[in-house]
């Protein structure tokens, strides 16, 4: 049985796509997972896959710290090279993050092929610096290729959990009725300002007969103040839901940040959206992520603004009072974002 090493660490944006891809392989490959101690993968990976932890850090900080971490990176790369030979790894799949750099360099030392996946429209630092040392770079958003001229790239899309691909009925706690269903995903980063914008237009949405599910994120105290929810049966406010696949598959409109994870979930569920990019995202990558969906008419971009302004309110009102939502849904249905896992597997098969 061929052996695949998955190097994914740190945030959900790196780990969840890798987990989704690993799960799609069934039992056809033996999988070894390379991560970092005390990060999210320690909670998510061991119950399914053999996790090997390696100490490595970024190159941030003062000159001494950067030099120290550079030495750790070189040492970790040698460790990875030895590990690859010991485990008889055939190919590496990595999704970025701290662990990607030593994995790519270690693979280069050991002569093992590497497929690097980049989810964002603007590649991260590791992808920009080390993508040229990989056999192939798979892209979640096609415009990222503009920044990777020296790399062999293919647009594959970003893997998502199987639940997003299945038809699902709405959770029982979602308001019933014929009104337009709007799902608001505040996200974990920078959600407070976006939630304030949405909270300001809730009376307008309710007045127009909409059903609203507002997922605020756990870092916002808004979800603790549920006076509005108590006053209207068509509004549900929660900090979090593990039933997002069902919500998006049934939603008429989503209002969301535009991180790579949100983009691929909206794409595979064919959900029209209003995207509010997080203005402090690295390299403003959320703006370009959003531009990808807006370019083919699947989304409208609204920049973060003072809730007292009527920008978001006017855009939502125009959507609800015209055929625009129907046209956006048609655009989403006509845009191909299918089978990312299959496309990635085909590349792995070709380079291994």
UniProtKB/Swiss-Prot annotation:
Cell wall biogenesis/degradation recorded as keyword: yes
One MF annotation (Gene Ontology) recorded for this entry: UDP-N-acetyl-D-glucosamine:N-acetylmuramoyl-L-alanyl-D-glutamyl-meso-2,6-diaminopimelyl-D-alanyl-D-alanine-diphosphoundecaprenol 4-beta-N-acetylglucosaminlytransferase activity
Gene expressing this chain: murG
Protein role: Cell wall formation. Catalyzes the transfer of a GlcNAc subunit on undecaprenyl-pyrophosphoryl-MurNAc-pentapeptide (lipid intermediate I) to form undecaprenyl-pyrophosphoryl-MurNAc-(pentapeptide)GlcNAc (lipid intermediate II).
GO biological process: carbohydrate metabolic process; cell division; cell wall organization; lipid glycosylation; peptidoglycan biosynthetic process; regulation of cell shape
Protein name: UDP-N-acetylglucosamine--N-acetylmuramyl-(pentapeptide) pyrophosphoryl-undecaprenol N-acetylglucosamine transferase
Predominant location: membrane
Record family assignment: Belongs to the glycosyltransferase 28 family. MurG subfamily.
Residues that coordinate or bind UDP-N-acetyl-alpha-D-glucosamine: 11-13, 120, 161, 188, 286
Domain of life, per lineage: Bacteria
Organism: Prochlorococcus marinus (strain NATL2A)
Gene Ontology CC, one term: plasma membrane
EC number(s) recorded for this UniProt protein: 2.4.1.227
Keyword Cell wall biogenesis/degradation belongs to the record: yes
Localisation: Cell inner membrane
Its membrane topology: Peripheral membrane protein
